[in-house]
């Protein structure tokens, strides 16, 4: 939990709140194993792989996540530690087009970078210290983001490669990678990267947030989505949460006190605005503040995960009653085969997943929620 005197403001609203007792019933290990197996099976796009890798890290190897302990992590790991994460990241790097700077060449700027944290972890903990394949792949991905990808005139990196277009999704994909790179690099170069990650969050907020406290999904470019898409708001809040966790656990945390306060406030804006629209059974709607939208378990799960993480870091328990309801809703929305039901189709944004079709990112969000809840209970 944040302790530095300059960061007391982060938890100021929690001063009158005692930590609540657990009100959510924990999802069983057997169910989580099924959810995980299904996630691995259907995660094929770059952002799905990156999100799945983050979910595996937070759930199975929490001490190696940006929420789990000091950064950088140990350079030498016990045999078998994070083997599933390392093997998947290795597979991506081995399959990388040698003529591409991005880890996967799929037309997006932000999405391939979502795999970057796991590639950096693989490089940091590699047993063959002469192997520079992973450091090269990560450096090329960073170079593409910072030096080649299109930007707005004030410096916001585009989420798309073919035109300048800002998506809320970007904050989960690229800034956490930039920040993690900085935390591992350290020194003045690392500090610059951590500040770059923060600055991207700041710029995106300026473009996407409106007076409701919620974020629009997509702005600029040849088309826009000005609705308050639940998953978009969840991506943004969760991405900023990862950047905050990275800064907080880095050796440079004391040099970025204001940035940590800002990020905490910006995350709280989204979760506070979102839970105002929670429905009686615990769900949020796909378009959060639109009564004619439909229930979406995906965004509900990720926003709940963020809220547990925020409570663990700051001691602010003001939304725990809401996220406990959300956790129970997610538990009841996972079927006997480990599939999360009642999700939005992640590629249309505006329609439910069809019968027999499931959301890869939704599967990951269940694991991220479960990991965040376990960490919250432990703290």
Where do the language-model regions lie?
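Fungal secretory targeting signals
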Residues: 1-23
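CBM-like carbohydrate-recognition segments
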Residues: 22-134, 148-153, 165-169, 284-379
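Extended ligand-binding clefts on enzyme/binding-domain cores
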Residues: 165-288, 293-304, 316-345, 357, ...
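Generic alpha-helix initiation/capping and coil-helix boundary signal
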Residues: 7-8, 16-17, 131, 190, ...
């Amino acid at each position: 939990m944040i302790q530095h005197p300059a960061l007391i403001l982060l938890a100021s609203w929690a001063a009158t709140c005692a930590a609540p007792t657990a009100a959510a019933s924990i999802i069983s290990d057997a169910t989580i194993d099924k959810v995980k197996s299904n996630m691995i099976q259907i995660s094929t796009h770059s952002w799905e792989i990156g999100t799945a890798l983050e979910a595996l890290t937070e759930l199975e190897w929490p001490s190696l996540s940006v929420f789990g302990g000091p950064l950088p992590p140990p350079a030498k790991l016990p045999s078998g530690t994070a083997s599933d994460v390392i093997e998947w990241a290795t597979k991506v790097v081995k399959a990388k087009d040698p003529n591409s700077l991005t880890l996967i060449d799929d037309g997006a700027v932000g999405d391939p970078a979502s795999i970057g944290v796991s590639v950096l972890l693989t490089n940091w903990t590699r047993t063959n210290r002469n192997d520079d394949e992973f450091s090269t792949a990560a450096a090329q991905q960073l170079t593409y983001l910072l030096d080649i990808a299109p930007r707005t005139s004030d410096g916001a990196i585009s989420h798309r490669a073919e035109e300048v277009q800002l998506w809320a999704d970007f904050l989960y994909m690229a800034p956490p990678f930039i920040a993690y790179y900085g935390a591992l690099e350290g020194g003045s170069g690392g500090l610059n990267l951590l500040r770059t990650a923060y600055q991207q969050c700041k710029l995106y907020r300026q473009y996407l947030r409106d007076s409701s406290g919620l974020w629009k999904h997509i702005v600029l470019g040849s088309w826009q989505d000005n609705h308050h898409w639940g998953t978009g708001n969840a991506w943004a809040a969760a991405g900023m949460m990862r950047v905050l966790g990275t800064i907080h656990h880095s050796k440079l945390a004391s040099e970025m006190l204001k940035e940590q306060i800002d990020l905490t406030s910006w995350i709280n804006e989204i979760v506070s605005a979102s839970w105002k629209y929670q429905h009686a059974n615990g769900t949020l709607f796909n378009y959060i503040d639109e009564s004619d939208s439909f229930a979406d378990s995906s965004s509900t799960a990720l926003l709940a995960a963020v809220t547990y993480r925020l409570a663990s870091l700051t001691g602010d328990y003001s939304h725990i009653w809401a996220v406990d309801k959300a956790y129970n809703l997610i538990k009841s929305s996972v079927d006997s085969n480990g599939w999360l039901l009642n999700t939005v189709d992640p590629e249309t944004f505006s329609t439910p997943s069809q019968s027999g079709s499931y959301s890869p990112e939704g599967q990951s969000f269940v694991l991220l929620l479960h990991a965040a809840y376990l960490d919250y209970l432990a703290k």
